Amino acid sequence: MDALLKPIYEGVMEGDQDLVVDGVKAALEAKVSAEAILKQGMMPAMAKVGQLFEEGEYFVPELLIAARAMQGGLDILKPLLTSEDVQPIGTVVTGTVQGDLHDIGKNLVGMMMKGAGFEIIDLGSDVKPEQFIAAVKESGAQLVAMSALLTTTMANMPATIKAFEDAGMRDSVKILIGGAPVTQAFADKIGADGFAPDASQAAKVALTLVN
């Protein structure tokens, strides 16, 4: 790894936002492209964080601070990535379904997907089916990632899928679901395209769904 990218990688791994921000600024001053900083510094670090989470070495707090550190760097890079015409892998609309106010898990999913190179449109929590549809229409997103943390709100997942069918948009968008009570069997039953048990897996499944 380029010596200039090492502090950025380590800063994300350690959840040290100052280290990431200083590293990004130093790399840019040394004429490293925003794309290289993102794809060779930050994205590999978030992938490693996801791997350590899956292996039980890292837990949710480590994921959160790593993602926050990465966001500090992304805030600097975003306008530069646009001017370099670096395209995201895909666009994902995220949200917790109608009636459900939980958003920590959904936020983590968004952060891990950003780390994998996706553009994220976060609708927040308590999102109605028509809000998901409007966001996809407006953004041209290829993927919708919905979460539910309560068994009572899970029923709003098939309702959202049906709304996409009724709008004639089901074939043009992939739907990924997750959340504590959600299972692969439930995803299969309601006709979702993918299921992820946690944020790290969500980013991996998203990559397979858009490719």
Cite the ranges covered by each PLM segment.
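Conserved, mostly hydrophobic/aromatic
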Residues: V20, G56, H102, M113, ...
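Ligand-binding pocket scaffold of soluble enzyme catalytic domains
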Residues: A196-P197
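Solvent-exposed alpha-helices and their adjacent loops that cap or buttress functional pockets
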Residues: M1, E84-Q87, K137, A167-M169
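Long amphipathic alpha-helical segments
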Residues: M1-E84
